[in-house]
């Protein structure tokens, strides 16, 4: 595997992680000879997290915000390698939408028209509820269309892979012939 960059800033942690680290230290101080497995400790920690007041949680949220600001500042000054997203080949076929997405596309405009002040998230949640309450007979056309699109995608994907392998083969053959000359 690749080597880790030792100079890369340490990633910021959430308020819950700050709480968990603090809880762990207090637990070790109070019961130094007691060992809890990860599962049991996590369970106790999450129970405690749910039971603490909003005021106490605010302390940890403030710590998380400070940590986030620290991380962002350090990343601005960081010169080393940054993680790069793998670039998608624009010629590669796109994955087809699911039956639910096809349903959502058809009903989005109607939901937005009925509720113009809703956000995209609210419309998506409403579409999800509509989908879950829709009977199988109404879902069937969307599922059939999705299946057709999926089959077409697999065909295109296979053709694309063959084309890519052909390009690699042609490249190797042209390289060999140029070396012979």
Curated annotation (Swiss-Prot):
Pfam families: HMG_box, HMG_box_2. One of its GO terms (cellular component) is chromosome. GO terms for molecular function: DNA binding. Keywords: Chromosome, DNA-binding, Nucleus, Repeat. Residues 80-89 have a biased composition (Basic residues). It is found in: Nucleus; Chromosome. The keyword Nucleus applies. Residues 9-79, 93-161 bind DNA. This is High mobility group protein B4.
